[in-house]
């Protein structure tokens, strides 16, 4: 990645002065931060897994009557 695309704070701007994207969509998948939808999907799956574990535990083991 060239350093001339970076702004004063080190981040890459979304658009160049002529309006074209600064970074192609292919490179956005491999460089920089993770997409928010991916983080939310993994986090949601983790929450559902923990809740499922609690429900499973309520029907088996200690406290299952």
From Swiss-Prot:
It comes from Prochlorococcus marinus (strain MIT 9303). Its main location: membrane. It is found in: Cellular thylakoid membrane. The gene is psbJ. Residues 1-17 have a biased composition (Basic and acidic residues). One of the components of the core complex of photosystem II (PSII). PSII is a light-driven water:plastoquinone oxidoreductase that uses light energy to abstract electrons from H(2)O, generating O(2) and a proton gradient subsequently used for ATP formation. It consists of a core antenna complex that captures photons, and an electron transfer chain that converts photonic excitation into a charge separation. This is Photosystem II reaction center protein J. It holds the Pfam family PsbJ. HAMAP family: PSII_PsbJ. It is a single-pass membrane protein. PSII is composed of 1 copy each of membrane proteins PsbA, PsbB, PsbC, PsbD, PsbE, PsbF, PsbH, PsbI, PsbJ, PsbK, PsbL, PsbM, PsbT, PsbX, PsbY, Psb30/Ycf12, peripheral proteins PsbO, CyanoQ (PsbQ), PsbU, PsbV and a large number of cofactors. It forms dimeric complexes.
């Amino acid at each position: 990645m060239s350093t001339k695309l970076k702004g004063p704070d080190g981040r890459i701007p979304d658009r160049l002065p002529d309006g074209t994207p600064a970074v192609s969509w292919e490179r956005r998948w491999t460089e920089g931060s993770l997409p928010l939808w991916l983080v939310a999907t993994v986090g949601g799956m983790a929450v559902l897994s923990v809740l499922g574990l609690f429900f499973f535990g309520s029907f088996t083991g200690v406290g299952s009557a």
